[in-house]
């Protein structure tokens, strides 16, 4: 949603029309599901966008990768891009390959949007490690590492209380 808005408003002046890659088979399937009718699941702001014809999870330049080969090609192409990769703590999955090929590049940014537990690679990066070990190699951290608070996909306390309050008393068994 936010990336689509950034692209729509041309907020990244240095790269006119950067591509965005969702690099996770599960995220690809979830995105496909969310491209359906979501009217019963959206807040007022999101519903207004949909009613105006905005596609919440689709925009020009969005690419959904699925295969390992597609994922590997992203690291071989030096075109400026956004790669959205799963494994929030960076301890497994495709993100580790993206980190290996991009952490050492000062023009890269590694952006976290969720909590990083102590002892994870994600927390190590946020804590400012000068280098990390990936696939048996020491990789210098020259990329800018940032954490955006408030974008986690997990519900907060108020949302959880609101959700659970919608349930009726359980039926006797």
Model region roles, listed by residue range:
Residues 1-173:
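Acidic/His-rich, metal-assisted hydrolase cores and their charged scaffolds
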